[in-house]
Amino acid sequence: YYRKTKDLINEAPVAGLSGFADMGKQNIGSLKNTGVEVTLGFKPIQTKDWFWSIDYNFTYNKNEITDLSGVSEGGLPVLTGSNIDQSNKVLAHQKGYAANSFYVYQQVYDKNGRPIEGCVVDRNGDGDITEADRYLYKNIAAPVTMGLSSRLEYKNWDFSFTLRASIGNYVYNNFDQTMRLTSENAIWAQNAYLPNRPLNTLYWKSDHNTSKITDMFVQNASFLKCDNITLGYSFNNLFVKGFSGRVYATASNVFTITKYDGLDPEVVSGIDNNIYPRPFSFIFGLNLNF
């Protein structure tokens, strides 16, 4: 498929002379989506006592901003989304890039591959670290999503499960960055967590933030989740004719396989502020028909 959307609404800078806030909702541009969707269904077994069905779906989608007329001066990114602290945003739109890309500094690492706290690349080579050294890196949307469900029946028994995968989505681990901030209350612990930063570089009796918005905190949040597993048993003419039903047990949010460092890789906003994790649940149920 191919789809182009125009007059998209997003927050954009407003002229100071307007008398309104410095940001406001505007129709700022156009976006195109290209991709493919595939759905497959199989029934490998269909006999008197056995029945087995498998359903699979696959989606690939790529989006790209094609226009940001009137708000992107000189092709600079348009910041969007919520603040990750009191004043900074980490998501941005720019023509030629995917929507909601991460706008970050490039982290510097030592010879052992460990990040040097507060040290980022001077990308424009002017000798100063400014906003101009930030760049667009990855985005929050997964280009590939997949789903797999299956149901197996044997006489009165039934068993089913649902799996879901998201591949290529990224999350800004803001909780990880926040834990690296330096303050007078936490200064004693810094050598334990940051062995590559000398103690004499810290400021005593003051809040001093050396942590920056870098690509180190933009983490691959691809995942495979088992949304539910159900086991059931159906009965007919129990005790009296016409009295039927089904008893079942369902487990939800069974497991998650991911390399993401946070509690849950499925962060819709793309910014992880230590979200409340989805709980595992177990349900017993009984359906009666008479």
Where are these predicted regions, by residue range?
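Conserved small-residue
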Residues: 26-32, 36, 43-140, 259
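Membrane-embedded beta-strands that build the outer-membrane beta-barrel scaffold
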Residues: 34-44, 52-60, 146-152, 157-165, ...
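Transmembrane beta-barrel outer-membrane domains
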Residues: 29-33, 139-143, 219-226, 275-279
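Membrane-embedded beta-barrel scaffold of Gram-negative outer-membrane proteins
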Residues: 1-19, 50-54, 59
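Extracytoplasmic gating/loop element in the C-terminal half of outer-membrane beta-barrel translocons
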Residues: 166-251
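C-terminal beta-signal and terminal closure region of outer-membrane beta-barrel proteins
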Residues: 25-33, 79-114, 186, 192, ...
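Flexible, solvent-exposed coil segments and beta strand-coil junctions
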Residues: 11-23, 123-131, 202-215, 261-268
